[in-house]
């Protein structure tokens, strides 16, 4: 189909040999952009004006951020370590649960005295070392930042070639007007169709592909991805008989496999409601302790309105009467504690038919995994059954699905109960709703079209002003592209993935796909939404109008729109990442919904969230793809793309170190990002193929060469991604290091001791099931609450005492 369409485009486009596209073609392409999306005829595409405006906005946003950072200093300090649960965990055990749900943060987290000035945080970004980031943020953050540095190096090489060689070649053409202020003279549209210099563009596109693969291989080869020894020795088994006992699971493996020792078998249970009750119980407990201490200081009882937003009510109405705070939270705590105890007693009656099984070494784990995977049907023939034991039938071994277990900190224990048919239906409904929403609202052009129906844009129709025609449209496109990751993120969150890595990978792939359609493909083709795209693609007039559509890509001023978009992303986008406006809005909403001062303090203490690697990868790769796609047809875009990546790298270093909690993911999220990088030079080849076909026809030497290179590249990529072939040609070259666990004390006579439990922090069991017995929880909670109040009080806390205690907590919290 692709060669036929391209050949048709060539035959249709070969008739278009004029120096410029006709006015009808321009109107046809610009019509989808509603007169205010692509600049038509302004000096140098309005780039200098947009650059100046965006830079001034960037400076203003940095000033606002510095003020907010100074004013909201203590919010971030409270957010990281003052949760009572985390404090107790850090002080009393090796296990702690730092990983909560995330969106973003509303204030800066800073514990280093070296950057507590008004603008000293700017220089502190450059003084942060990778070792400090690894210790505080984890290995995934170092992986992510290394990825950015290699993209920056790639853009430096591409920028030197594009600006130093391709740009003068484009400028040497004479098809467009001989005007120093004409943006079109810098694009490939300025060259004649018979110019032999077009071979340079095709060769450089292939060179950029090779540079991209080399850069990613260098990135992956330098990153030693560390995997815990426990993870490599643990298998996750799904499909077990629901009421299978751990001893039977151990017996099966030790009978079926010689020299196999099972250290631990942990069945999984439905703990979603138990975790919810535990969280609510702790909130009520903290509220009771807060008002008890407050009453002991002020000797007056506190009254609260227990309704949501009750503290905002200025009058007392029926049904919203105030109640005594200690009495309210005491009753609520007792009720939740009773519900929690009852649910904990019933949790063993809710098995999920899953288990985590830990073995004594990696070798036997690999043998068992290979044995079960080899039994999967291939075509119509099945290659046998797994090894049997006396417990095989009762355990339903033939129904097992076996894989390596994720890291315990990577698991959403509350989501394990959502599985099978219910999970697939839930996922299907969510993604259908998401697709329908984005199907009609893919680009800002469709919004502007709706506004235009009510004559909203009529007053500015005749204004040929860069601010009207370029600044606001590109800003609008950035706003929509910023909103899209949030929508896609919440869709992935409601899908209830079992692991954080799976959630981030889904977010990354979906965000990247929709962003490429929104930002690159549809605006380039002069289409306003996916709705129009599919109607154009499957219309009977497709072949007749295809040539005109692809001419939209190579209009002289088309590249200016994307240059201005990259400028907006570099300055306004990165500045907004520093401010984290969505997180600030969410924080304000949560404060408004809080029912008392205790709950508002609890909101302040739960601002710090994990960094969203999936959304960050997707947005960054979208801008990089736009830059690489137009790096040859519009080479002036590359320096601005490099500027975006440099600012993005600095902003992410700051956010990772000061604003977000560490996240524990697997290497699949990083390898998926590497795969997406290769899509950028492939799209660049597509753009050159379309241009060559439109100008010279499909059978021209440049068109055929580009087509052959493109087909070979796509075949290699598909074979590698789908079947694992061409590993030496791939962009992956990861080296994995295993973090060995000291098992000297757990061995008896050279053989692992089966009666010694794994360290508490490494257990494959939900945190809520690792807590102490219900009888001891009340006393322990009182002690935790007392310690919490000693550490954090609203008014009477000495800053020096807080800082010293906080430093010890941070060291215990982060260094583990």
Curated annotation (Swiss-Prot):
* Recorded coiled-coil stretches: none
Superkingdom in the source lineage: Eukaryota
TM annotation in the entry: 47-71, 139-171, 196-220, 421-450, 466-495, 500-536, 560-592, 613-631, 635-659, 667-695, 701-721
Record's keyword annotation contains Transport:
yes
From the UniProt entry, list the residue stretches annotated as the region Intracellular linker IL2.
224-419
Its subcellular locations are: Cell membrane; Lysosome membrane; Early endosome membrane
Please, where does S-palmitoyl cysteine lipid attachment map on the chain?
57, 119, 375, 391, 719, 722
Residues on Cytoplasmic side: 72-138, 221-420, 496-499, 593-612, 660-666, 722-816
Catalytic activity entry:
Ca(2+)(in) = Ca(2+)(out); Mg(2+)(in) = Mg(2+)(out); K(+)(in) = K(+)(out); Na(+)(in) = Na(+)(out)
User: What are the recorded GO MF terms, alphabetically?
Assistant: calcium-activated cation channel activity; mechanosensitive monoatomic cation channel activity; osmolarity-sensing monoatomic cation channel activity; phosphatidylcholine transfer activity; phospholipid scramblase activity; sphingomyelin transfer activity
Q: Which keywords annotate this record?
A: Calcium, Cell membrane, Endosome, Ion channel, Ion transport, Lipoprotein, Lysosome, Membrane, Palmitate, Transmembrane, Transmembrane helix, Transport
Membrane topology, as annotated, equals:
Multi-pass membrane protein
The answer on whether this UniProt entry bears the keyword Cytoplasm reads: no
The known PTMs are summarized as: Palmitoylation is required for localization to the plasma membrane and stability.
List the InterPro entries.
Answer: Csc1-like, CSC1/OSCA1-like_7TM, CSC1/OSCA1-like_cyt, Csc1/OSCA1-like_N
Residues in compartment: Extracellular: 1-46, 172-195, 451-465, 537-559, 632-634, 696-700
Where is region (Gating helix) located? 560-592
GO biological process: one example? intestinal stem cell homeostasis
Identify the GO cellular component terms for this protein.
actin cytoskeleton; early endosome membrane; lysosomal membrane; plasma membrane
Instruction: Explain the purpose of this protein.
Output: Mechanosensitive cation channel with low conductance and high activation threshold. Osmosensitive cation channel preferentially activated by hypotonic stress. Also acts as a phospholipid scramblase in response to changes in membrane structure: upon changes in membrane curvature and thickness, alters its conformation and translocates phospholipids, thereby controlling plasma membrane lipid distribution.
Q: Which family does it belong to?
A: Belongs to the CSC1 (TC 1.A.17) family.
Q: Tell me how this protein assembles.
A: Monomer.
Name by which UniProt lists this protein: Mechanosensitive cation channel TMEM63B
What is the organism field in this record?
Gallus gallus (Chicken)
> What are the leading ranks of the lineage?
Eukaryota, Metazoa, Chordata, Craniata, Vertebrata
């Amino acid at each position: 189909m692709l060669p036929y369409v391209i050949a048709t485009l060539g035959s249709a486009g070969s008739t278009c040999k004029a120096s410029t596209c006709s006015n009808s073609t321009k109107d046809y392409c610009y019509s989808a952009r509603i007169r205010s999306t692509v600049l038509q005829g302004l000096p140098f595409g309005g780039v200098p004006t947009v650059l100046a405006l965006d830079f001034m906005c960037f400076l203003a946003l940095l000033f606002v951020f510095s003020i907010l950072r100074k004013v909201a200093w203590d919010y971030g300090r409270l957010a990281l370590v003052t949760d009572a649960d985390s404090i107790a965990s850090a002080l009393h055990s090796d296990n702690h649960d730092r990983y909560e749900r995330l969106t973003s943060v509303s204030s800066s987290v800073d514990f280093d005295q070296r950057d507590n000035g008004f603008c000293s945080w700017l220089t502190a970004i450059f003084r942060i070392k990778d070792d400090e980031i690894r210790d505080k943020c984890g290995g995934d953050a170092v992986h992510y930042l290394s990825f950015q540095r290699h993209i920056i190096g790639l853009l430096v090489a591409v920028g030197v070639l594009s600006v130093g060689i391709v740009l003068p070649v484009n400028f040497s053409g004479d098809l467009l007007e001989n005007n120093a202020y004409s943006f079109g003279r810098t694009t490939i549209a300025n060259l004649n169709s018979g110019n032999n210099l077009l071979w340079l563009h095709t060769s450089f596109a292939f060179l950029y592909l090779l540079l991209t693969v080399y850069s990613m291989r260098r990135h992956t080869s330098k990153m030693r991805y560390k995997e815990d020894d426990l993870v490599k020795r643990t298998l996750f088994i799904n499909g077990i008989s629901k009421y299978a006992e751990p001893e039977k699971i151990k017996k099966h493996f030790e009978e079926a496999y010689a020299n196999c020792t099972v250290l631990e078998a942990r069945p999984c249970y439905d703990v979603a409601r138990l975790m919810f009750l535990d969280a609510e119980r702790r909130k009520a407990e903290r509220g009771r302790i807060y008002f008890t201490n407050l009453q002991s200081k002020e000797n007056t009882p506190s009254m609260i309105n227990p309704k949501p937003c009750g503290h905002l009510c200025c009058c007392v109405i029926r049904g919203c009467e105030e109640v005594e705070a200690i009495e309210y939270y005491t009753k609520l705590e007792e009720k939740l504690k009773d519900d929690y105890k009852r649910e904990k007693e019933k949790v063993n009656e809710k098995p999920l038919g899953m288990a985590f099984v830990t073995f004594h070494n990696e070798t036997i784990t690999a043998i068992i995994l290979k044995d079960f995977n080899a039994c999967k049907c291939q075509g119509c023939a099945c290659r046998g059954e797994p090894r049997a034991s006396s417990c095989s039938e009762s355990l339903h071994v033939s129904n097992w699905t076996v894989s390596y277990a994720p890291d315990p900190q990577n698991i959403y224990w509350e989501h394990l109960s959502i599985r099978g048919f219910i999970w697939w239906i839930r996922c299907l409904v969510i993604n259908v709703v998401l697709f329908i929403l984005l199907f009609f609202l893919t680009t800002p052009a469709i919004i502007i079209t709706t506004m235009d129906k009510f004559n909203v844009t009529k007053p500015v129709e005749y204004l040929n002003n860069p601010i009207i025609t370029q600044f606001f449209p590109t800003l609008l496109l950035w706003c929509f592209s910023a909103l899209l990751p949030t929508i896609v993120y919440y869709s992935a969150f409601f899908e209830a993935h079992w692991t954080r890595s799976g959630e981030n990978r889904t977010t990354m792939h979906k965000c990247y796909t929709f962003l490429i359609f929104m930002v690159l493909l549809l605006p380039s083709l002069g289409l306003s939404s996916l709705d129009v795209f599919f109607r154009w693609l499957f219309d009977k007039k497709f072949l007749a109008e295809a040539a005109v559509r692809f001419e939209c890509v190579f209009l002289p001023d088309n590249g200016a729109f994307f240059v201005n978009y990259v400028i907006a992303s570099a300055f306004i986008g990165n500045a907004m990442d520093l401010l984290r406006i969505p997180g600030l809005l969410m924080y304000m909403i949560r404060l408004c919904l809080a029912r008392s001062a205790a709950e508002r303090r609890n909101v302040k203490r739960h601002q710090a969230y994990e960094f969203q690697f999936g959304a960050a990868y997707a947005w960054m790769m979208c801008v990089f793809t736009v830059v690489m796609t137009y790096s040859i047809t519009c080479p002036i875009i590359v320096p601005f793309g490099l500027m975006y990546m440099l600012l993005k790298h600095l902003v992410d270093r700051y956010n990772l170190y000061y604003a977000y909690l560490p996240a524990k993911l697997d290497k699949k999220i990083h390898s998926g990002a590497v795969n997406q990088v290769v899509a950028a030079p492939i799209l660049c080849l597509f753009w050159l193929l379309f241009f060559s076909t439109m100008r010279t026809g499909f059978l021209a030497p440049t068109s055929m060469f580009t087509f052959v290179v493109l087909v070979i590249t796509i075949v290699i990529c598909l074979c590698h991604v789908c079947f694992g072939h061409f590993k030496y040609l791939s962009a992956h070259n990861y080296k994995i290091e295993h973090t060995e666990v000291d098992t000297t004390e757990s061995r008896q006579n050279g053989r692992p001791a089966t009666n010694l439990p794994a360290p508490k922090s490494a257990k494959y069991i939900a945190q809520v099931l690792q807590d102490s017995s219900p009888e001891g929880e009340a006393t322990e909670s009182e002690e935790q609450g007392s310690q919490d109040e000693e550490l954090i009080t609203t008014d009477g806390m000495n800053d020096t005492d807080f800082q010293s205690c906080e430093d010890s907590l941070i060291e215990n919290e982060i260094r583990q």
